[in-house]
Amino acid sequence: MHILVVGLDYKSAPVDIREKLTFQPDELGQAMAQLKEEKSILENIIVSTCNRTELYAVVDQLHTGRYYMKMFLANWFGLSKEDISPYLKFYENDGAVEHLFRVSCGLDSMVIGETQILGQVRTSFKLAQEEKTIGTVFNYLFKQAVTVAKRCHAETDIASNAVSVSYAAVELARKIFGDLSDKHVLILGAGKMGELAVQNLHGHGIGQVTVINRTFSKAKELAGRFSGAAKSLNELQCALMEADILISSTGASGYVVTKEMIEHVNKLRKGCPLFMVDIAVPRDLDPALSEVEGVFLYDIDDLEGIVEENLKERQAVAEEVELIIEAEIVSFKQWLNTLGVVPVISALREKALTIQAETMQSIERKLPHLSTREKKLLNKHTKSIINQLLRDPILKVKEFASEADAEEKLALFTQIFDIEEAAFPDGERQDERQPVHAFKRQNPQGLTSIASE
């Protein structure tokens, strides 16, 4: 059993590739359910955001799992494996656990320390629970990932004053225009990204804000909180005629603003420049807009320069988070170690309790005059003897799980107590059931492992 991550992010793929491989929120549950049916996949969770699409899975074989996860991505989005292979990253076992913890803490985000990703990981985790695509390993691992992120936020300053992609978009506007007090900004999309953009603009004394959203009531609610105006999507062209800056972050699957639309609007703008920032993935703004005179178009990847400044400032804090993550990986591995010995411990307990039950039946046959109270006392104390006798062997077998020769020791243990058949009813050997042994064989070099095809 192995843990495997297959995916791409803003570091490995440009936005024109990422937008082709982004799961829509309403199809994520179906995608997880379908991925679970693929060969080798035992458990899975999909995390898909504007900056990453990643498949997390527990697999029975690394090579097979890697192949079928890659093919699943290609088939789902109607692409060939050759189309997506150059952009994919692979994390295995320890490297996969480390990667999940880094992602959840915001350490792997374009904007270091941003907390939005934690909410997105939790949403995917909850959906996987509802779809029943996860089991023991991922239930534990993703709960720990959330706990690790909360610990990092509480014990370090990683989330303090962390900027967002929306903040970076506003900063880009400030770098170009300087003073924003006489500018009219149009926000397209009233979701979290749009809300953060309005918040940042308001903090920098923007002259006027107009919010447009597919659901007008949401646009009105957001605009009202910041003394802005709200318009319906039908009024988009009119709003574009008045705007100096457009920041777009809808969840649309196609372009919301096209080249043809802006060419029509431009005739009425009389040559006034229009600054446009697209922070949506898939993109809201047609890339062909950059060909229109007077239009200055930027997408999410163009914000990297502003984000770099944030990275330098937060590097020292990031190192503190790395130390917490390393300790938490050790903790997870200790828990994972015990999974391999669970059937051994269960078989030992079952055998001991069977002996105790048979002994009680024998006593009751030989001493028929025993009262109900006396039988209960005898039952209680014989079970107590069993528990005390098993305590040290169980502690010892848990210690075996972390040792290099664990397989040999566990085999000897099951022979001594004559429980091999009960512990492994299907004839499975211990190395087939012990995930951490696989971790040690496949990833001997340390904490991080990014595999290549």
UniProtKB/Swiss-Prot annotation:
Q: Which GO terms describe its molecular function?
A: glutamyl-tRNA reductase activity; NADP binding
Q: Quote the pathway field.
A: Porphyrin-containing compound metabolism; protoporphyrin-IX biosynthesis; 5-aminolevulinate from L-glutamyl-tRNA(Glu): step 1/2
The segments labelled Disordered in the record are 426-453
According to the UniProt record, what class of enzyme is this? Answer: oxidoreductase
Which residues hold substrate? Answer: 49-52, 109, 114-116, 120
The answer on whether this UniProt entry bears the keyword Cytoplasm reads no
Which keywords are on file for this protein? NADP, Oxidoreductase, Porphyrin biosynthesis
Which HAMAP family does the record cross-reference, listed alphabetically?
Glu_tRNA_reductase
Q: What is known of its domains?
A: Possesses an unusual extended V-shaped dimeric structure with each monomer consisting of three distinct domains arranged along a curved 'spinal' alpha-helix. The N-terminal catalytic domain specifically recognizes the glutamate moiety of the substrate. The second domain is the NADPH-binding domain, and the third C-terminal domain is responsible for dimerization.
Assembly behavior: Homodimer.
- Can you say what this protein is called? Glutamyl-tRNA reductase
- State the organism named in the record: Bacillus licheniformis (strain ATCC 14580 / DSM 13 / JCM 2505 / CCUG 7422 / NBRC 12200 / NCIMB 9375 / NCTC 10341 / NRRL NRS-1264 / Gibson 46)
